[in-house]
Amino acid sequence: MKISAEKTKLITNNTSGINTEIKINDQKLEAVTSFKYLGSLITDEESKPEILSRMAQTTAALKRLKPVWNDRSISFSSKIQLMRSLVTSIFLYACESWILTAELQKRIQAMEMRCYRKILNISYKDHVTNEEVRAKIQQAIRAHEDLLTIVKRRKLQWYGHVSRSLGLAKTILQGTVIGGRRQGRQRKR
């Protein structure tokens, strides 16, 4: 197997003051703070840049479907189903590994409301509350699960899948280490 030094990038986490110079065939690897891998943004931070990137991609997909949202011959329930299958699937890609903060949860809810308002053709100037928008969505489709709930459910499903498996992923996720401590009070060093 050959490793290309031009294509290979180096990303590190929490390495302040540590020399991270790696060479392949006397060529130094480029150190980066973020890169795209399989459609996901990998960064040396938490998952906020990835979630914001997914939100931007979702908004772009929503705008590309504007002729569908403005078409009066398509029923409202069909538009919601189209949004769920075409738009939110972009957002939910790899959501199982996200770290959700309170700020990011609010942003996810706001983005979902923006999508529904775009479909319903409701402007913020119309002063329609989020509860009224949710009621209209609930009327159109009976079983409605908001986006944040879907993300949380997928995270739990993924955790259950990994915790039932045997192997390195389970060991890393649960932080279990082979061995143990001796009984009694531990010695001071």
Language-model features, listed with the residues they occupy:
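Short linear motifs embedded in intrinsically disordered, charge-biased segments
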Residues: 1-189
